Amino acid sequence: MTQQYPLLDKINSPADLRRLPRTQLPELCAEIRQFLLTSVSQSSGHLASGLGTVELTVALHYVYHTPEDKLVWDVGHQAYPHKILTGRKQRLHSIRQKDGLHPFPWREESEYDVLSVGHSSTSISAALGMAVAAQRQSLRQKVVSIIGDGAMTAGMAFEAMNHAGDIKPDMLVVLNDNDMSISENVGALNHHFARLLSGRFYTSLREGSKKLLSPLPHIRHFASRAEEHMKGMMAPGTIFEELGFNYIGPIDGHDVDTLVDTLSNMRSLGGPQLLHIVTQKGKGYRPAERDPIGYHGVPKFDPKESSLPEKAPGIPSYSEIFGQWLCDTASNDKSLMAITPAMREGSGMVTFSQQYPQQYFDVAIAEQHSVTYAAGLAISGLKPVVAIYSTFLQRGYDQLIHDVALQNLDVLFAIDRAGIVGADGPTHQGAFDLSYLRCIPNMVVMAPSNEQECLDMLTTGYQYKGPAAVRYPRGAGVGLELRKGKVIDIGKAQTLTEGQNIAFLNFGTLLPEVEAAAAKFNATVVDMRFIKPLDTACLDQLMTTHSVLVTVEENVIAGGAGGAVSEYVAQHKASPQVLTIGLPDEFIKHGSQGEVRAELGLDAAGIERQVNDFIKKS
């Protein structure tokens, strides 16, 4: 590092931070913000969220005695400043890269990362467990959950708060509100009010009054209503108070001095506390302030430019192809209802949301609700399409079984980010969907090998009377000239190459790698297309003409498509040996998609190597 960061250079841990005089904290915040911008612009990563939490992160580590006190970050997009202050600034340039820093807080990486995260809305539940454990073990540690306003749209967050309000452990929830919808409430009066409400005099008076008035419920109720009326004039915290939390705020999340004062007061309070801060996503970098969504996750870019580099024209992504299919289908069918749990941009639905706003529903981070909401639409004669990432559909699994499949409802699941997603790592890999879908009765499960097949399968699933799923990967297809999607026969595979002895059964978009490997063995190649139902007629023929069946999928081997083939062969006491190639029984680390596939033996060379090893052992 250079003289550009004179204060930050001195900080290798929060203990170093706590040795700084308070007067230098604003200067340190400016250095962290500049360091974050410079580092991420050179390496890519999540930017806007971290820019918005610099002052909060500094104040938390300044007031709380980390790592003894526990900071529990939700999701982790906002935790880059936390990594910088906890001894990882020299490696920040490696974040999200193979063998580099993990993209989110990760327990194996640092003692300051007390909860590994990636999915949203988990922090309050985990922090509550830690707070209860601390009380049971008579520990003096404090526990803080830091959660964004987006994550607060998930029911799990309120389930945890409801429980915390009931059992009342000592804990703090910091609500980082960067939507700016209540920015007019942030000012000098509220700074004074926050200090007042978090101070010992007010809280002692408040708790003492409760005890004094407890035998007099009518008077206590009147006093409570009067208190809420006073606070409600300036603080929109009634819902949190009803859940049993003492609510403080909203305060300016970029005023580090006010944050330190307020957090210092709140650290000494007992029971569940909630501090509501207002921040600006992308704070301090004007392009990110103007376009916080665009600067949420960024490629390498020049900070001196006023915009991110334009994406070079090329082969459309599967997400873009899905979005165009939605628009084309909705143009002729007003019954189509598209649903996403807060993944409009990532799922390719921006244009659809603009052209068909009455047929578009962003239900926020509420995967369970999105699935059952789709069930209700289907019951009423509409045709819902749930666009969801593979890793997030896991969160709506019971609803998929109980509310959709059990009732055999017409719901299409467009499952994006299936297989290896790359830089976001183990919390986001779409590794399990084939396994958890194929065991559900009534489901039709499809995996296209290219973008044209994806269009055909979306059309097929949409027309199908019952629940259907199409899973496709992150990234672009192979560059086919696309025609309109057409309905294909359910459960029918396609034989692409006739060979001898060995048959490769491909499930999904690894087909080019499979074909390259199969050519080395003069093998048959079959694009299976359907995981459920399997093309059993095709399997019957292959079992009589080939001695080795090789299944290839970008899903865990356990319970996946290869398992379905192995089960069928075993049930029929057939002679072919079955080699299943897919993801191993482990959580897949971060790195580029190509790097991860090569490391796991899912490129052409790796597939060829695994087949050769299998034949040698046979």
UniProtKB/Swiss-Prot annotation:
Cofactor names: Mg(2+); thiamine diphosphate
Binding-site residues for Mg(2+), renumbered to this chain? D149, N178
Q: Which SUPFAM superfamilies match?
A: Thiamin diphosphate-binding fold (THDP-binding), TK C-terminal domain-like
Pathway-wise, it operates in: Metabolic intermediate biosynthesis; 1-deoxy-D-xylulose 5-phosphate biosynthesis; 1-deoxy-D-xylulose 5-phosphate from D-glyceraldehyde 3-phosphate and pyruvate: step 1/1
Name the InterPro entries for this protein: Dxylulose-5-P_synthase (IPR005477), THDP-binding (IPR029061), Transketo_C/PFOR_II (IPR009014), Transketolase-like_Pyr-bd (IPR005475), Transketolase_BS (IPR020826), Transketolase_C (IPR033248), Transketolase_CS (IPR049557)
> How does the cofactor attach, per the note?
Binds 1 Mg(2+) ion per subunit. Binds 1 thiamine pyrophosphate per subunit.
Q: Which HAMAP family match?
A: DXP_synth
What is the stated purpose of this protein? Catalyzes the acyloin condensation reaction between C atoms 2 and 3 of pyruvate and glyceraldehyde 3-phosphate to yield 1-deoxy-D-xylulose-5-phosphate (DXP).
Quaternary state and interactors:
Homodimer.
Return the protein name: 1-deoxy-D-xylulose-5-phosphate synthase
Q: Which organism is it from?
A: Idiomarina loihiensis (strain ATCC BAA-735 / DSM 15497 / L2-TR)
Question: The organism's lineage?
Answer: Bacteria, Pseudomonadati, Pseudomonadota, Gammaproteobacteria, Alteromonadales
